[in-house]
Structures are given as structure tokens and as C-alpha cells.
């Protein structure tokens, strides 16, 4: 069954392209990817990302459980704030990249990828059942994916919009810090976060979903529709644009961010054609707290000892051409890797991408060739982001 977000009907009416993504029928663009992309880089855009997964972990053992099933140290951030962390399998491969918020009172909210929440649901509950065989565990795991609406407001003008709507300056929050706010009586969680490289915030709140898989929980999304329309109306003076998943992908790629399923992944059951990727290969070791035990740690330590089979690197095209997932990467005629993400940068007007290559080439400044339509095209490896961070991005010079 194709999944749909709360205000799918609004998107269906206003978006020029709607199609399935990770099992969800989602808006890809409303006007054009380029127009929406540049609106976020230069002004402000709003994304409906209610297809993202959410879990609530409650109980005295919630923290200990999360410390074991994720890689980072989530014990330090105070309520209410989040930690970027990873869920790994026993082989050290990335099951998903997640954000875990400490909500206080032994309660945590995890935000995960849209195509990972079902397998994570099964994974977490299987681990819990395994623990219960040896004793009691004070832990409740609740999957809130279909109940939670999530909107992402991104761009340099997002700060002005947050001040107007909620009376807060998001620059007073550290990255992933959150506050409980209200909009016209609708209570929600607001976090300084995003997936575009720009400054911005995201809001979470529960509402009825007319497409909920449980018929008893279906209803009209009055809150979600009101919040969406209110933000659009308030943002008109700032040139706000509704933005689809197409622009979200080009924005994250310009920022150099990984995408689950492309840069981070694990082998699926009975599959032999999907390479597994560990956080060491994907330059995500900043999200690993080594002074604790977690699933996959032993495998990562062994990989560190024997060396990496490949490593992630960013590159930009020198010759004309747009790199795409699966294209081969060469160095002096030798096959050294493969592209995992690529696009034509709407901001820079050149081809950019991410590839996994032999580790010795995964440094900036290496001249490589990308095979595009059967022909080698010159490219060079670079350090992310692709744009000038003094002119664009969350920490641009004002």
C-alpha cells in the first residue's frame, strides 16, 4: 500500500509532480526544482517531510537501550535537545541515520528516514524482546510515524519567519536544540535543524491522518493544514515557496550531506547486490562515541584494523556533464569507484556528486574521470560544501 502524508490532498492539488518515493506518494516539485532550490538558498522554503519516521521511547531503561542501539552519546544533551546518531547492524553497516531528542522525564523521540522506520520498528522490538528473556525492562517503544506531522522551514529568511510566528530567535538555539511552542493554540516541538545546509527550523506535532493505515485513526488533518497554510501566508513577504523532494535532494547534495540508501546502506534480506557501508567509510565517525558499547562496535574496530575497502569523497565536474548514481569513477584509466549521488547544481550550474573510491583517492584535490554516457569526463575531488560557506549556508557572513 502506498503511504501518504497528512495533507497529501493539498500537495496533489498544488504540485506539478507527485510520485512515489520510498513507498510514500510525495510532491517532487511545485514550480521547478531550480526555482524551489534557489528560494531556499536565497530566501525561504517550506517542505512537508511528514514521511519521516518518528519513535517515542519511554521508561527508566529508555536511555540505556538507546545508548546500546545507537552510536553516539545521547546521555549528555539536556532536555530539550537532539543528537545526531546512527543505528548499525552487527556488521557495522548503517541501518539508518537518526536524530534522537531528549524530551525529559525518561522520554526520547527518534526521527529516522522514511524508508527505514518499518525495519527499525522490527529491529528495536526484536532487541527489546531479547532483553526481556533475561529480565524485566522498563521501556515502551511507540511508532508515531503516521501520527506525526513534520514541516521543515529552511533558508536565510527562516529566522525572520520564526520570530514572527513563534517569537523566538532560532539563532539563540544551538543546532538540534528544541523548544515547545504554540501556533494558534496548536502545540508543537520546534527544533533548529534541517537537511539543506541553510539555517532553519522544523516543527513536529500530532494530527489526524486521512491516510492512516489504521482506519480507526483516520480523520481530517485540520491542524496540519492550518499550520501549513499559516506558514505560507506569513512567509509571503519573504518570498516563501513550497518545496518538494527534488529540491531537498539537490540542496542536501550541495551541502555535502549523505542520503540513506545512497551513501549509507546495509544489505537487505536475501539481497546480494547492495554493498554495505559503515560510518567509517561514509566519514560519519564524528557520530561515534567509542567509550560505550553499542551494536556494531566490534565490527568497526576490526575494520579500522584491516583498513577500509572504500571511502566517500565529494567531487565537482571540470568537463561538462552531470554525474548520476552508478556511474563509474576512474583515475588514470583505472577503475577506482562509483558515484552514489550526483546532480547539476542549481546554484553553481555545474555537475557535482558523491562517490565511494579507493581510500587513497578520498582526499580533496585529486583529478579523476567520471564515465558519463560511455565517455570519461574530467572531475576533481573537493571538500564539502560545494558552495562558498561565506556566501551561502547556515553560517554565512551577514
Swiss-Prot record:
Family annotation (HAMAP family): GcvT (MF_00259)
Assembly behavior: The glycine cleavage system is composed of four proteins: P, T, L and H.
Enzyme Commission code(s) on record: 2.1.2.10
Catalytic activity: N(6)-[(R)-S(8)-aminomethyldihydrolipoyl]-L-lysyl-[protein] + (6S)-5,6,7,8-tetrahydrofolate = N(6)-[(R)-dihydrolipoyl]-L-lysyl-[protein] + (6R)-5,10-methylene-5,6,7,8-tetrahydrofolate + NH4(+)
Protein name: Probable aminomethyltransferase
Role played: The glycine cleavage system catalyzes the degradation of glycine.
Annotated organism of origin: Thermococcus kodakarensis (strain ATCC BAA-918 / JCM 12380 / KOD1) (Pyrococcus kodakaraensis (strain KOD1))
Record keywords: Aminotransferase, Transferase
GO terms of molecular function: aminomethyltransferase activity; transaminase activity
Pfam families given in the database record: GCV_T, GCV_T_C
Annotated Gene3D superfamilies: Aminomethyltransferase beta-barrel domains (3.30.70.1400), Aminomethyltransferase fragment (4.10.1250.10), Probable tRNA modification gtpase trme, domain 1 (3.30.1360.120)
Single biological process term from Gene Ontology: glycine decarboxylation via glycine cleavage system
